[in-house]
């Protein structure tokens, strides 16, 4: 059996608010541990660059412009991307038949892939691949090829693979209109069910699941000009080559060709399902223009509210978010935890580093009681941990937080921004691991932040002072001595700093008051100092009016 989740619905409902970003504050993590103000500054043509035109009913026209067929190896897509970058970018227009061009969300949702048509189902493999139809938001024609024995073959569109509503079923095209994406199923949670494992659909977006997870945040191939006042550029995966997996392996490999006005690229994803599903990513980029505002290993998520910042919400649910914090382990091995926020204005923070060990958007709150949502089950959303391979050099982890009033809007973006621009006409190779799961980054000895809450410091009378409460979880035995707390701010006044044992979680609770005075933005930092050598997370937070 195949258990079909709501991946299509979630992709469709998650409207991309990044297209209309407004001006916001940008800050940079400086050597003193605080953020300082920074200024917000501002593909080759395919083999056949003609638009695909619908053919007459009954006539089949295979569309192969990017997805090279025939002999295939690990450098095939790299060679295609290199050739693509030498020519001007061509914005392809692949009009859908009128019966599909303007369908509604409900009509698109009714177009369902038939599980019995899944690729490799008849082969008895542990993986089965399904395809997504074009339509609604997903208008781009995506080419897909299957690789077996070093040979790639084109996977043509077949209307018989889909069911649709009564009217639409009669009007599904017979010509090769391609697909809008793919998803792969695997018996992740039970030997008798093929659960969704990962999805590639929409621009360069993709997502995956660890054991027991439900879809939440997404990753992207590349981010360009995120939070730029002139608008963001969204590269697209034009074509995929999916290698047929072996019978006795837990590995499946997907190759992808990335294209945009600014860059072309070749990606190789080696995917291993498990408690934490791991993707080994190899990316080769060929900039057409200088890329000064580029984001590597970008993740996109949603944060609406939590116990830290509920004053602007009227919701029966205590928390609503796909991720609740940004975790970083910098090049010096320091663990940094930055709770997410739903700010009043666009906020962009940059945390300077040299050769980061890892970073990612985490969902740490795993108790249903803290969400109370019987449908969304935010407690099951995966975290995503990025592990760079090799020395990525100087740069910054950049966090973008966008105001939102609805959970259907992704409003959180995190990625690595190199310090030096990527030069036009050059070739860049980056490798990294993406780990999806409930605890993709777990240190058995670390003292970690488990919860951040804030509220008015004096409940008896109005006051600008804010009370912050931070809970720390101790992994393993507690230290023999109580840590020494230190709380700092680059503006305003910190007072009443108290650290006490928290028997409820075998950890500690740190509380303090913050008086912003006349400022509208401040960077807060809390540290616990131990007498013994043990990793302890440093808590960072941006307070805004």
Curated annotation (Swiss-Prot):
GO terms for cellular component: outer membrane-bounded periplasmic space. GO terms for molecular function: carbohydrate binding; catalytic activity. Residues 1-35 form the signal peptide. It comes from the Bacteria. Pathway: Glycan metabolism; osmoregulated periplasmic glucan (OPG) biosynthesis. Its main location: periplasm. The keyword Signal applies. It is found in: Periplasm. InterPro entries: Gal_mutarotase_sf_dom, GH-type_carb-bd, Glucan_biosyn_MdoG/MdoD, Glucan_biosyn_MdoG_C, Ig-like_fold, Ig_E-set, MdoG_OpgG. The keyword 4Fe-4S does not apply. Keywords: Periplasm, Signal. GO terms for biological process: beta-glucan biosynthetic process. Involved in the biosynthesis of osmoregulated periplasmic glucans (OPGs). Belongs to the OpgD/OpgG family. HAMAP family: MdoG_OpgG. This is Glucans biosynthesis protein G. It comes from Vibrio cholerae serotype O1 (strain ATCC 39315 / El Tor Inaba N16961).
């Amino acid at each position: 059996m195949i258990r079909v989740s709501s991946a299509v619905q979630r992709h469709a409902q998650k409207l991309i608010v990044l297209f209309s970003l407004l001006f916001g504050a940008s800050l940079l993590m400086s050597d003193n541990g605080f953020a300082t103000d920074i200024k917000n500054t501002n593909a080759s043509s395919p083999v056949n660059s003609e638009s695909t035109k619908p053919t007459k009913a009954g006539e089949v026209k295979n569309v192969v412009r990017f997805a090279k067929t025939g002999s295939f190896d690990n450098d095939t897509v790299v060679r295609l991307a290199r050739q693509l970058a030498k020519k001007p970018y061509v914005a392809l227009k692949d009009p859908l038949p009128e019966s599909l061009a303007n369908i509604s969300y409900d009509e698109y949702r009714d177009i369902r892939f038939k599980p019995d048509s899944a690729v490799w189902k008849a082969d008895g493999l542990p993986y089965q691949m399904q395809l997504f139809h074009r339509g609604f938001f997903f208008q781009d024609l995506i080419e897909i090829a299957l690789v077996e024995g070093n040979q790639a073959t084109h996977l043509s569109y077949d209307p018989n693979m889909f069911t649709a509503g009564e009217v639409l079923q009669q009007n599904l095209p017979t010509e090769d209109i391609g697909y809008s994406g793919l998803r792969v199923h695997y018996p992740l949670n039970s030997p008798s069910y093929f659960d969704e494992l990962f999805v590639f659909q929409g621009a360069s977006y993709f997502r995956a699941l660890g054991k027991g997870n439900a879809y939440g945040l997404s990753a992207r191939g590349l981010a360009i000009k995120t939070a730029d006042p002139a608008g963001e550029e969204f590269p697209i995966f034009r074509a995929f080559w999916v290698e047929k997996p072996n019978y006795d392996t837990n590995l499946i490999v997907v190759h992808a060709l990335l294209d945009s006005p600014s860059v072309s690229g070749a990606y190789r994803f080696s995917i291993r399902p498990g408690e934490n599903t791991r993707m080994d990513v190899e990316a080769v980029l060929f900039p057409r223009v200088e890329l000064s505002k580029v984001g590597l290993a970008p993740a996109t998520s949603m944060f609406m509210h939590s116990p830290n910042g509920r004053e602007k919400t009227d919701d029966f649910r205590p928390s609503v978010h796909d991720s609740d914090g940004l975790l970083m382990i910098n090049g010096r091995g320091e663990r940094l935890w930055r709770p997410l926020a739903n700010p009043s204005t666009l906020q962009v923070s940059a945390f300077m580093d040299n050769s980061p060990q890892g970073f990612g958007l985490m969902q740490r709150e795993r108790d249903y009681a803290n969400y109370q949502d019987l449908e969304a089950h935010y407690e099951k959303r995966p975290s995503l941990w990025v592990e760079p391979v090799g020395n990525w050099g100087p740069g910054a982890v950049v966090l973008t937080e966008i105001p939102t009033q609805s959970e259907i809007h992704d409003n959180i973006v995190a990625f690595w921004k190199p310090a030096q621009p990527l030069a036009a006409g050059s070739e860049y190779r980056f490798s990294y691991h993406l780990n999806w799961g409930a605890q993709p980054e777990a240190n058995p000895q670390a003292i970690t932040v488990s919860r951040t809450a804030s509220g008015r410091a004096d409940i008896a009378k109005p006051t600008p002072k804010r009370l912050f409460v931070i809970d720390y979880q101790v992994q393993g035995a507690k230290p023999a001595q109580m840590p020494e707390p230190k709380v700092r701010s680059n503006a305003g006044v910190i007072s009443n700093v108290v650290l006490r044992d928290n028997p409820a979680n075998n950890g500690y609770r740190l509380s303090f008051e913050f008086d912003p005075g006349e400022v509208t933005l401040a960077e807060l930092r809390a540290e616990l100092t131990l007498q013994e050598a043990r990793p302890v997370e440093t808590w960072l937070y941006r307070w805004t009016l």
